[in-house]
C-alpha cells in the first residue's frame, strides 16, 4: 500500500 508521509515532489 502507499505510504502517506512526505510528498514525492
UniProtKB/Swiss-Prot annotation:
Photoregulated by reversible phosphorylation of its threonine residues. One of its GO terms (biological process) is photosynthesis. The modification Phosphoserine is found at residue 3. Coiled coil: none annotated. It is a multi-pass membrane protein. The modification N2-acetylarginine is found at residue 1. GO terms for molecular function: chlorophyll binding; metal ion binding. The keyword Methyltransferase does not apply. Keywords: Acetylation, Chlorophyll, Chloroplast, Chromophore, Magnesium, Membrane, Metal-binding, Phosphoprotein, Photosynthesis, Photosystem I, Photosystem II, Plastid, Thylakoid. Signal peptide: none annotated. The LHC complex consists of chlorophyll a-b binding proteins. This is Chlorophyll a-b binding protein.
Amino acid at each position: 500500500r502507499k505510504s502517506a508521509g512526505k510528498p514525492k515532489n
